[in-house]
Amino acid sequence: MKSCEIGQQGESAAALFLYNKGMSILERNWRKGRFEIDLVCQDIKTLVFVEVRTRKAKGMLLPEQTLTISKRCNIIHSAQLYLMDKKDWSMPCRFDVICIISKKTTLELEHYKNVFEFYEIMDSSNTSWQPW
């Protein structure tokens, strides 16, 4: 199976997993320019931006080890663009990561909630990420 097919399989499994946990799936693979969010969900009154990391079982790195600082910054920036695009700043937000290991016939899935914050990409002045 090709890398992109494994990624798509992982994203589909993650969306189904979150749906079965009671979340609403609002967007899949939302894009703005070069920025992308794998899944945008709503968990009761919280907007959840989900990064899905899928790897083959025989890979050298675990999925969670591939989430670099640069990638986190891109995810946070993507979320800011999403909120600006939708013009809806009313809900609290969080960032989740779903790590999936693709084995021959099964997927092993781990869900990590609230793994990083908007302020991680801010400078030391802690300027608000909201537009006002």
Swiss-Prot record:
One family name in Pfam for this protein: UPF0102
UniProt-recorded Gene Ontology molecular function terms: nucleic acid binding
Domain of life: Bacteria
SUPFAM superfamilies, alphabetized: Restriction endonuclease-like
Family to which this protein belongs: Belongs to the UPF0102 family.
Protein name in the entry: UPF0102 protein LI0223
Source species: Lawsonia intracellularis (strain PHE/MN1-00)
